[in-house]
Design a protein with these regions (language model features):
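Phosphate-end processing signature that detects enzymes handling 5′-triphosphorylated RNA
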Residues: 1-137
Length: 137
């Protein structure tokens, strides 16, 4: 099982001009205590991800992910009910990292969050000007 190490930030200002790609994502969650199952639908592909609880700082947690046939992912997505989101994800290269900036729609309209995956909790990274308050954890 892989460990996911990431930091998250609110976003302010123009971030779209440096995006190299954008994709529409629908995802739903089934949560049981500190463990969550995420069903993600991207175009014609589906994924299931199980995430464990985060460490004290919230930057690291165990994650297991597999691709699913789209028809199965759509069935599981329906089971998530109101625990679903709709967003556009922009990929923005900055230095040696790719920032994933999510612009939410629907009930979360106006929320924009950037995340960067790291190889360790202590890895340094170049902070782009569009990053605002850190919300990791």
């Amino acid at each position: 099982m892989a460990q996911e190490i990431e930091r998250k930030f609110l976003v302010q200002g123009d971030f779209k001009k440096n995006a190299t790609s954008v994709i529409h994502i629908q995802q739903g969650y089934i949560i049981n205590g500190m463990v969550s199952m995420r069903i993600r639908v991207l175009k014609d592909r589906g994924y299931i991800t199980i995430k464990g609880p985060g460490n004290k700082s919230g930057t690291t947690r165990y994650e297991w992910e597999r691709e699913l046939p789209l028809d199965k992912a759509l069935i599981l997505f329906e089971l998530c009910g109101i625990h679903s989101i709709n967003k556009h994800r922009y990929l923005i290269p900055v230095g040696n990292h790719i920032f994933e900036v999510d612009e939410f729609h629907g009930a979360n309209e106006g929320l924009i969050i950037a995340e960067v995956e790291l190889s360790s909790e202590f890895e340094s990274f170049e902070k782009p000007v569009f990053l605002a308050e850190e919300v990791t954890g």
